[in-house]
């Protein structure tokens, strides 16, 4: 179920405050955040966020195509090591 249009996008207040401060100053420093649930809004474009994946902070540079998605979508939490192609070599 999607979020109601009348409610608007959810962005953590502390994260929005940091973005507004940087936009006012005209700087684009990396913003470290644990808020994977925050939706990317148009004023986030051009900023780099360090999104926490449970172990480390993954840098995410926001572009126009990311607007409407959540920050957590661009910082995967699970690492896929890959499937073993042929198990016969390891059995020897």
UniProtKB/Swiss-Prot annotation:
InterPro entries (alphabetical): Ribosomal_uS19 (IPR002222), Ribosomal_uS19_bac-type (IPR005732), Ribosomal_uS19_CS (IPR020934), Ribosomal_uS19_SF (IPR023575)
Gene3D superfamilies linked to this entry: 30s Ribosomal Protein S19, Chain A
Entry's Gene Ontology BP terms: ribosomal small subunit assembly; translation
Any one GO molecular-function label of the UniProt entry: structural constituent of ribosome
GO CC terms, sorted: cytoplasm; small ribosomal subunit
Pfam families, A to Z: Ribosomal_S19 (PF00203)
Domain of life: Bacteria
Keyword set, alphabetical order: Ribonucleoprotein, Ribosomal protein, RNA-binding, rRNA-binding
Coiled-coil spans in chain: none
Family classification: Belongs to the universal ribosomal protein uS19 family.
UniProt function note: Protein S19 forms a complex with S13 that binds strongly to the 16S ribosomal RNA.
Protein name in UniProt: Small ribosomal subunit protein uS19
Organism: Bifidobacterium animalis subsp. lactis (strain AD011)
Lineage: Bacteria, Bacillati, Actinomycetota, Actinomycetes, Bifidobacteriales
